[in-house]
Amino acid sequence: MEYSAAPVDLDVVRRYRLDRLRREMRKRDVAGLLLLDPINTRYATDATNMQVWCTHYETRCVLVMLEGPVVLFDYANHPHLVEGLPTVDEYRVMSTFYYFAAGPDVEEDARRFGDEISDLMRRHGGGNRRIAVDRLSHLGIDGLRANQLEVGDALPITEHARAIKSPEEVALMRASLAVCEAGCRAMQEALQPGITENALWAKLHETNIALGGEWIETRLLSSGPRTNPWFRECSMRKIEAGDLVCFDTDLIGPYGYCSDISRSWLTSGKPTDEQRRLYATAYAQIRHNMEILKPGMSFREVAEKSWPIPDEFLAHRYSVMIHGVGLADEYPSIKYRPDFDARGYDGILEPGMTLCVESFTGAAGGREGVKLEEEVLITETGVEVLSKYPFETQLL
């Protein structure tokens, strides 16, 4: 973030993240790692260029060689965007092959792209033709395979690399959370009967951008009868006195780190007994599920020891009990006990993992629901709660 003082040496973070990727590449005997997802290119290099726009098109990518350079293929020719970055060894302009840019020449341009990647693999791969790719259209994959490259999936590499944060990364996540929570405060101060859901949500956006944040991934704020079931996006509905207002920040703050917390508030007046029951239930769930976490636990053990969801709330339970968070929501995804055998996978909690502990509590056919979520760090001895925004004592 230019014209501001970072809380840590950003080059230390950049080198750590690149080293994490190469460690995972080495485990899987991969010579090259081709990244197009803007979150992964950010993790590898910290070079940014129209992050959200670049999610639409294959217009920018990074090739990380295990025993060679990191080459950034950028949108157009803007080498000033990587000046001073220790993680970019070579800067090139990407040979794009999506129809908007290439028109009828898409196949020819895709072959040119494949030739360029193949040449770098030949020069720096030591005879290893294994390349892992996070996401690429069939035209791009065909261009790689036409050059006898063995294409594999990069996501096991990137997700496991991103899962363990350095102390410096955690410091940046705290900075992002501070901005997120300032935005929550601005929303809560603006909450009064008559404000629309969209106008309230705008307070979070405004604060995030003003304080150096980047964007918000979702529009998950709803009020009153729109809170249950969960996942309705914010609207022009005017919030009424006595409504519960629930939101999930999904905020990409300063330095690109995601702050993902959820809160539920009462709009003026006194809560009903049902509102207090819903809130207390959601609060009990996330408190229990945070307190059981410790390094060395398997994901299955977490699921088995998790808070048992009452039958009346099972149908509308959140899609995941716990998930990782870093530059975005990420590995791991730990399912609830009833879902684990059918949809879950196992793994181990490790120090340095940053996780979000989720709850949505709303009965099928009920008028309202409560969404709560906390962000935590797995330490050497247990868990530290990173998010500090207060809960609503009047609802407990």
Please name every model-derived segment.
Residues 1-396:
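Active-site neighborhoods and metal-handling regions in enzymes and metal-associated proteins
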